[in-house]
């Protein structure tokens, strides 16, 4: 018998997401991190709308919205001339916008959530080595007291960054290369009069090539920005090599760190307004690689976040992609711990997330070289892709067939939000996302006529049996459908938004996965498809 259900190595945003999602499903976790305390650095800053949707489902959206600042767009300057402004516009039906939040605040909020779920982080404790057999993972930890501890876990999740012990222990390849560019980062205040809420990108270009660059991302606080810029020669780490050959991330501890004078020198060259930098909170040199593992796990061990993929920070994709890795994996591991994982459920983590990791690595590398404005396609689609709202799992072995949707999202697509849903005893409408905050699958049964209500009851009963009771069910009724005898929880689609957002047909079943993606659509709702699908996912 294992000492713990899941051991998580690394307590950054990815590890904390995995731990919180497992703990709130009753899975016993240990979360270890080699650092004695959280780093007070604004490393990852951009928070994508899809991540905010995840935080809504996890139960920390209010805290995030109170702490973050909105990102309205980006101001572009080339050789001192202002270019076209990039507005971060999204369709009105998308519930959240782009935001900026320093990574240390993201980690604080996630760790607070973990504590509320009954978990904690063991700091100063590092994974040293591990081995697995068909039944358990045997791990060795180094302790802050100087000793070691041996333990067994049913599963191990490596969220331990670009130099991951878990990735190396699995023998995964990490193909890619380092980029020649080096950047220095600084968290400072400036006194310019540029509009609040906008990132700033100012470059110097000669013969079509950028030879100097300044990027400023707004942070919470008055005129406060996380600035990145080319590293001057006296701060370069170009000759330094990391022991494992992976050159990526902050390297301030390996040499002199940038001071205000270095940042001010770049501002004097590239700032679109004369300004003075003050109140330097931290600074470092940042080196970049692009790499991805050949697989996201093996047996009882998995990798997520920077342990699985690293790439340029353009578009704020890295942390957000890692959070989605963890969010995809956690519900599947929880099902396995509870003995309700069908064949292929855990394997679907690699099948679903690795193609997305490849796409993100390729796209961020392209943007680092040419900018987001060089992307083909219309700007609206580009913005939805950057917001991570177009990523999905069509064709996955654990979702239904594409083509089952009449006119709306297909199995594998993100489940969209909608408003105007009315409970009989509530005077105000609610949004669909409020129904999807549960920990299990949610089955939505749409009825546009009273004749379909009996089949909704039958569909719910059969689905709950197939899911071993681990299923939330709600009937969604067209505005004029009366259902006094319905035994299910029900809402009325008061503004017809659900029908339009989903292209829902009368008598249809829509199954939403715990990670907010559609698993199946089926008509009629009481046919064999839904129970069979749930049995496949969760075992018989």
Regions found by a protein language model. Give the residues of each.
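Core Rossmann-like FAD-binding/catalytic domain of the broad FAD-dependent monooxygenase superfamily
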Residues: 1-381, 385, 474
């Amino acid at each position: 018998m294992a000492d713990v259900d899941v051991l998580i190595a690394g307590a950054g945003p990815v590890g904390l997401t995995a731990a919180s999602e497992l703990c709130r499903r009753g899975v016993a976790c240990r979360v270890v991190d080699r650092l004695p305390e959280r780093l007070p650095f604004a490393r990852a800053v951009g928070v994508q709308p899809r991540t905010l949707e995840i935080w809504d489902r996890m139960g920390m959206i209010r805290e995030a919205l109170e702490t973050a600042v909105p990102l309205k767009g980006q101001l572009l300057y080339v050789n001192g001339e202002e270019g076209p402004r990039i507005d971060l516009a999204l369709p009105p039906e998308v519930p959240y916008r782009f935001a900026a939040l320093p990574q240390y605040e993201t980690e604080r909020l996630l760790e607070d959530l973990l504590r509320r779920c009954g978990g904690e982080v063991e700091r100063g404790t590092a994974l040293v080595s591990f081995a697995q057999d068909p039944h358990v993972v045997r791990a060795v930890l180094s302790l802050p007291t100087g000793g070691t501890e041996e333990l067994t876990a049913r599963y191990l999740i490596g969220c331990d960054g670009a130099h991951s012990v878990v990735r190396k222990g699995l023998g995964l390849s990490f193909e890619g290369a380092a980029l020649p560019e080096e950047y220095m980062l600084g968290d400072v205040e400036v006194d310019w009069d540029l509009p609040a809420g906008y990132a700033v990108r100012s470059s110097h270009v000669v013969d079509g090539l950028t030879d100097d660059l300044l990027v400023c991302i707004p942070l919470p606080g008055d005129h406060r920005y996380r600035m990145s810029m080319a590293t001057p020669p006296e701060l370069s780490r170009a000759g330094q090599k990391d022991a494992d050959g992976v050159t990526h991330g902050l390297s301030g501890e390996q040499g002199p760190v940038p001071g205000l004078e270095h940042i001010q020198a770049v501002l004097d060259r590239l700032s679109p307004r004369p300004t003075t930098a003050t109140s330097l909170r931290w600074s470092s040199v940042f080196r970049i690689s692009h790499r991805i593992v050949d697989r996201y796990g093996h047996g009882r061990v998995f990798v997520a976040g920077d342990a699985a993929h690293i790439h340029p920070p353009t578009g704020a994709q890295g942390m957000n992609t890692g959070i989605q890795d963890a969010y995809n994996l956690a519900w599947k591991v929880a099902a396995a711990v509870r003995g309700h994982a069908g064949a292929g459920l855990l394997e679907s983590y690699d099948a679903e997330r690795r193609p997305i990791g490849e796409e993100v690595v390729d796209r961020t590398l392209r943007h680092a070289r040419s900018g987001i404005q060089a992307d083909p396609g219309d700007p609206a689609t580009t913005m939805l892709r950057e917001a991570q709202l177009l990523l999905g799992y069509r064709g996955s072995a654990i979702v239904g067939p594409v083509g089952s949707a009449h006119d709306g999202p297909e199995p594998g697509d993100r489940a969209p939000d909608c408003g105007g849903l009315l409970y009989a005893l509530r005077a105000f409408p609610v949004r669909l996302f409020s129904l999807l905050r549960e920990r299990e699958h949610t089955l939505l049964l749409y009825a546009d006529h009273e004749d379909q209500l009996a089949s909704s009851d039958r569909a719910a009963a059969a689905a709950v049996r197939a899911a071993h009771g681990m299923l939330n069910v709600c009937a969604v009724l067209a505005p004029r459908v009366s259902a006094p005898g319905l035994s299910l929880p029900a809402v009325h689609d008061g503004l017809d938004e659900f029908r339009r957002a989903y292209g829902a047909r009368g008598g249809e079943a829509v199954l939403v996965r715990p990670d907010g993606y559609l698993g199946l659509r089926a008509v009629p709702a009481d046919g064999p498809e839904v129970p069979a699908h749930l049995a496949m996912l969760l075992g018989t």
